[in-house]
Amino acid sequence: MRKQIVADNIHGETGLDGPVFESLTRQAESTHAVKYIIDTLMASDGDITLVPVGPLSNIAVAMRMQPAILPKIREIVLMGGAYGTGNFTPSAEFNIFADPEAARVVFTSGVPLVMIGLDLTNQTVCTPDVIARMERAGGPAGELFSDIMNFTLKTQFENYGLAGGPVHDATCIGYLINPDGIKTQEMYVEVDVNSGPCYGRTVCDELGVLGKPANTKVGITIDTDWFWGLVEECVRGYIKTH
C-alpha cells in the first residue's frame, strides 16, 4: 500500500467541506471494511451489487483474500475512470489513480462491471440554476445539496476556471434506479499500471481493435433532464420521510 492520495483541492480538508454538521454520535465500526465485505458477500445468495464511488482498494483486497466472493457479486457499478481525459492527471481519473493496482484486480476479476466514468458524469454539470432548483425543493436535503455544491462550484472555478461542477457519484445510483436513463457500451477495459504519464488510465477499447472480449459496460451518455428530476424527487422525498 502506498501513501494515500486525496483531492482536498476540490472537496476541502474534511473531504466534505461546505456544510456545517452536528457533532457525531455514531462510533466507527470495529470490523475492518475488507472483512465486512467478505463476510457479507459469503452470507449472501449472489444478490448484492457493489457501488464503489471511491478507490477500489478494499474490494480488491477482499477479492484477493477470499476469491470465493467473486460469484457472490451480482454486479459492480463503479464511479471512476474515463475513456477520454482524466481529471487528476491528463490520463487518469482520481478514483482509479488513487490505487490503479486495485482497479486492475477488479477489472480482471470477471465480475460484471459498469463503469460510470468522467465522460458521462461530466454531463451532469451542476450550475447555480440547478442549486436554486434544489433549494426551492426545500428541507434539509435541499440545504445540504446547496452547501455542498456551492463549495464545489467555488473549487471548480478556482482549480479549472469552470462555472459549474459535475455530480459524479449520484449517477451510479441513478443507473441502479433506471438503467435506461444511461446509455452504455460494452468494451474491453484495462487499467494501466505502468509507471509513466498514463499510470492509472482506464484504457477502453471502444472500437474493439484488440479483439479481446468486453469486460465492462462503459457509461456513454445520460438523460440529464431525467437525472436532475430524480435528484429533485429524492430531495423532496427526504422532506416527506423526516
From Swiss-Prot:
Transmembrane spans: none
Q: Which Gene3D superfamilies match?
A: Ribonucleoside hydrolase-like
* This enzyme's EC code(s): 3.2.2.8
Q: What's an example Gene Ontology biological process for this entry?
A: purine nucleoside catabolic process
Q: Which reaction does it catalyse?
A: a pyrimidine ribonucleoside + H2O = a pyrimidine nucleobase + D-ribose
Q: Which gene encodes it?
A: rihB
How is this protein annotated for GO cellular component?
Answer: cytosol
Q: Which UniProt keywords apply?
A: Glycosidase, Hydrolase
- Protein name, as recorded: Putative pyrimidine-specific ribonucleoside hydrolase RihB
Q: Where does substrate bind?
A: 156, 168
The lineage's top-level taxon is: Bacteria
Cite the SUPFAM superfamilies for this sequence. Answer: Nucleoside hydrolase (SSF53590)
Q: Which family does it belong to?
A: Belongs to the IUNH family. RihB subfamily.
The terms under GO molecular function for this entry are: purine nucleosidase activity; ribosylpyrimidine nucleosidase activity
Which CDD domains has this protein been placed in?
Answer: nuc_hydro_IU_UC_XIUA
